[in-house]
């Protein structure tokens, strides 16, 4: 339902104002009420004035340009702690002016240095007047001049202990003496190559081999694995070198390592030169006397009976006979050992082929 309210102002005596309500019900406009009402002449129809809000004047204070107060510089003495430190000395203005003028004439950096110079030069007169002088307890005489140390004894002891901790061994200087020999061994293999001195009792073959080997290299015996145990690899055996007990490390890293080809060639040449000529025996009717001689001392002599038609034995020397006998027996034993290994290998191969 829509309601239409219509106000009509009627001019007349009573100045009545009628309100007409027009109601539309189902599309029909009807006038329901029409009632007059009195208008109060004292009431003004003018718009009411808006209330004025009180104005508050808020003025922001400008930021203060002055920050926190600066820390005042300390006027205390910053030198060695002595009796009387930090105390001001009051003197007449004429004395202060004379000291200031003397500082400029002497070229000192401060007035305190000038006062110290005055005390040092006036020390004889002070001693004559007082009997003791103005020498403090911590002052020292260096080349006839009194010196006051700027560091305490505790600081100097700490510095000395620190230097001692840094040093690995006793030293009388800050530098390392290259020519100084190290008394204790480090336990590591040396880098530089060293030469060994063979004693005169060493064998001739080992001497020749050591002389022909490259410097810094040592011979090694490679022993192959047994044919019966194929899983075990070959291992190397380093021969015992005769010499004094203070020899350097056996295995040394050469500074300039030689090539393997030169090492193999040197070993082959050494073995060729160390092998003596074969023994030549001429049959005779008597017996052959073979002696084992080491150097010039006769150790033992063995007699072997052998049928022969001539009376003579042709040998180079007794030492060559001993060496030849040793090599002959060694070659013979090695040959037997090789035959045994070959026989075992052949039997193993035959057994495997028969099983398959």
From Swiss-Prot:
One record GO biological process: negative regulation of leaf senescence
Principal location class: nucleus
Locations listed in the record: Nucleus
Domain TCP: 75-129
Keyword Manganese annotated: no
Pfam family, one: TCP
Alphabetical UniProt keywords: DNA-binding, Nucleus, Transcription, Transcription regulation
Residue stretches of biased makeup (Basic and acidic residues): 74-85
Example of a GO cellular component annotation carried by this entry: nucleus
InterPro entries assigned: TF_TCP_subgr (IPR017887), Transcription_factor_TCP (IPR005333)
Taxonomic superkingdom: Eukaryota
Span list, region Disordered: 57-85, 151-171, 302-322
Tissue specificity as recorded in UniProt: Expressed in archespores, pollen mother cell, ovule primordia and megaspore mother cells.
A GO MF label: transcription cis-regulatory region binding
Comp. bias (Low complexity): 308-322
Complexes and interactors: Interacts with SPL.
PANTHER family linked: TRANSCRIPTION FACTOR TCP4-RELATED, TRANSCRIPTION FACTOR TCP9
Record's protein name: Transcription factor TCP9
Native source organism of the sequence: Arabidopsis thaliana (Mouse-ear cress)
High-level lineage: Eukaryota, Viridiplantae, Streptophyta, Embryophyta, Tracheophyta
Gene that produces this protein: TCP9
């Amino acid at each position: 339902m829509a309601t239409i309210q219509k106000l009509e102002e009627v001019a007349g005596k009573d100045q009545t104002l009628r309100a007409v309500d027009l109601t539309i019900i189902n599309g029909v406009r009807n006038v329901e009420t029409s009632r007059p009402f009195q208008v109060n002449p004292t009431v003004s129809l003018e718009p009411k004035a808006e209330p004025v809000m009180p104005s508050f004047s808020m003025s922001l204070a400008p930021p203060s340009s002055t920050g926190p107060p600066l820390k005042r510089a300390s006027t205390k003495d910053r030198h060695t702690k002595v009796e009387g430190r930090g105390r001001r000395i009051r003197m007449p203005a004429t004395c202060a002016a004379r000291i200031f003028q003397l500082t400029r004439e002497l070229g000192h950096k401060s007035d305190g240095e000038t006062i110290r110079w005055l005390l040092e030069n006036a020390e004889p007169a002070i001693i004559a007047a007082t009997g003791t002088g103005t020498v403090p307890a911590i002052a020292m005489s260096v080349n006839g001049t009194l010196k006051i140390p700027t560091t305490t004894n505790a600081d100097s002891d700490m510095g000395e202990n620190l230097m001692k901790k840094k040093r690995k061994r006793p030293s009388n200087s800050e530098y390392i003496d290259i020519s100084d020999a190290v008394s204790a061994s480090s336990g590591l293999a040396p880098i530089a190559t060293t030469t060994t001195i063979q004693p005169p009792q060493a064998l001739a073959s080992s001497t020749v081999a050591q002389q022909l080997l490259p410097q810094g290299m040592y011979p090694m015996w490679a022993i192959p694995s047994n044919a019966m145990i194929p899983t075990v690899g070959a291992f190397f055996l380093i021969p015992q070198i005769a010499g004094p007990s203070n020899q350097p490390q056996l295995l040394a890293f050469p500074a300039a390592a030689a090539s393997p080809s030169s090492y193999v060639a040197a070993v082959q040449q050494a073995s060729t030169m160390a092998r003596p000529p074969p023994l030549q025996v001429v049959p005779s009717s008597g017996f052959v006397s073979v002696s084992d001689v080491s150097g010039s001392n006769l150790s033992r002599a063995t007699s072997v009976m052998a049928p022969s038609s001539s009376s003579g034995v042709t040998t180079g020397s007794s030492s060559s006979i001993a060496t030849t006998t040793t090599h002959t027996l060694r070659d013979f034993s090695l040959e037997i050992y090789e035959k045994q290994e070959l026989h075992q290998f052949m039997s193993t191969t035959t057994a495997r082929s028969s099983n398959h």
